[in-house]
């Protein structure tokens, strides 16, 4: 709370940065960033955005239902007192730890493999993540859950960063920020 208050006071010392409005009149379509949807006319971008949306849906399902899924094993006597059931949140939080650490790998991966291969690694990591999560159990298969949570970092970070760079590379400067927004909407 003190740090937040300190940052609030600091923000009042920053210089005034007026927004450059430009001389041209913008249409409602431009103001709302809807021109980014024109990217769906390009096959490569349409496939990318549809895949991103499907990945985003899968991500939201696993994020939203991971805890109830793990906790549901308490109805099976052999799993009721296992670590994965008793500490589902701790197990799931390994994903965030992995995500935090894997973001440090991105510069290395992009330099050595390039955007397309990093994106392919991310896609394979998503398959591995969902497969391990679906096949694991909180007893003898808890290692699959743990590995699934670790792989999540590579899957999430590599796809989101390489995807953002891909959108940046493939779009015109005039709609780039709208295209980035569309990418975020599709993946989240």
Residue ranges, per PLM feature:
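Loop-to-transmembrane helix entry/capping segments in MFS-fold secondary transporters
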Residues: 85-86, 171-186
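C-terminal ends and interior cores of transmembrane alpha-helices
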Residues: 125-138
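Intracellular juxtamembrane helix-capping segments at the cytosolic ends
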Residues: 157-172
